[in-house]
Amino acid sequence: MSPARLRPRLHFCLVLLLLLVVPAAWGCGPGRVVGSRRRPPRKLVPLAYKQFSPNVPEKTLGASGRYEGKIARSSERFKELTPNYNPDIIFKDEENTGADRLMTQRCKDRLNSLAISVMNQWPGVKLRVTEGWDEDGHHSEESLHYEGRAVDITTSDRDRNKYGLLARLAVEAGFDWVYYESKAHVHCSVKSEHSAAAKTGGCFPAGAQVRLESGARVALSAVRPGDRVLAMGEDGSPTFSDVLIFLDREPHRLRAFQVIETQDPPRRLALTPAHLLFTADNHTEPAARFRATFASHVQPGQYVLVAGVPGLQPARVAAVSTHVALGAYAPLTKHGTLVVEDVVASCFAAVADHHLAQLAFWPLRLFHSLAWGSWTPGEGVHWYPQLLYRLGRLLLEEGSFHPLGMSGAGS
């Protein structure tokens, strides 16, 4: 059957998807999606004094990126800065010029998100900004304060015992680099608005290997739709699953990856920060009860699932770091999971609920089953996940998404 004749069926599937997703999203108002399991809140680990996250220099691709030049009020780039009048944030503004309120939109979005987290964590306490955009040259050369991409923050009560946890909340709010720099403040910064790494989506490096049903191990760059790769079934057991399409395929793009290293057995997996990985807080959890977690939220001491002998087994996370590599590949399998570098991962990214994502992709799986063929994967982000991402932004809570969003989504 030709793709042209199948198009009406696909449109019907999308309409049916909307009918399914809208009641689930709106039926309980601002609360969680109907049918989703309530998970206990994840324990937040405060940053130690002088610790920074991610554990790379601030002006590298894996963090906030390079310095792009000072912005003055008279410069063309001044229009990139926007004032922040959020009443839930206190701005010190010691210059009395309003400069501390000026920042890039990305910085503003992260700061507003952090302000909510601060009020939830400490009722009656607000976020306080001591330094924002700097036009007077008070910071070191090539400081991101000169571009409106950095802020120094405290809590309104100036309780220094809170600053380690404040730094962790800033990481969770999506700042691209957070540094517990001083006993007097926490430093946070973001990527530039037009940075190529500003949105990461969910991918693996080109050289990451998967296992085929034949037993051969191949790089993701060599995988094609129709291949059967090792994955995890709904019951937590290993299975081989058909590769349907590539949700993202960008062979020539540099990406910043989160590197998860385990011990007993040793494994090393690189994936983008917004990608979902299955984790548990102890090794006694059955595989089917491991929860989907953003890669950027995985911490040493947690457990991930790895391919062992026999079946799948937990492995303790020993270290987490960042790495920049060329190429980005995100295959979608029939089961919505795959085993990459012998570590079990979800096929999905950007949205926190793996099961909701798997449900949302059933029209694509149906279309694939009706139009089986030897398709050559194109480059870039597939249109369907972009559509779902935009739809989800309208229907789901902000907390349902990773702060870095999805590459090419235009959000």
Curated annotation (Swiss-Prot):
Tissue: Expressed in embryonic lung, and in adult kidney and liver.
Annotated positions binding Ca(2+) 2: 95, 131, 134, 136
Positions of the record's site feature: Involved in cholesterol transfer: 248
Protein name stated in the entry: Indian hedgehog protein
GO cellular component assignments: endoplasmic reticulum membrane; extracellular matrix; extracellular space; Golgi membrane; plasma membrane
Marked site: Involved in auto-cleavage: 272
Lipid group attachment sites (Cholesterol glycine ester): 202
Keywords from the named record: Autocatalytic cleavage, Calcium, Cell membrane, Developmental protein, Disease variant, Dwarfism, Endoplasmic reticulum, Glycoprotein, Golgi apparatus, Hydrolase, Lipoprotein, Membrane, Metal-binding, Palmitate, Protease, Secreted, Signal, Transferase, Zinc
Effect ascribed to mutating residue 95 to K: In BDA1; decreases the stability of the indian hedgehog protein N-product
Lipid moiety-binding residues (N-palmitoyl cysteine): 28
GO biological process per UniProt: bone resorption; branching involved in blood vessel morphogenesis; camera-type eye photoreceptor cell fate commitment; cell fate specification; cell maturation; cell-cell signaling; chondrocyte differentiation involved in endochondral bone morphogenesis; chondrocyte proliferation
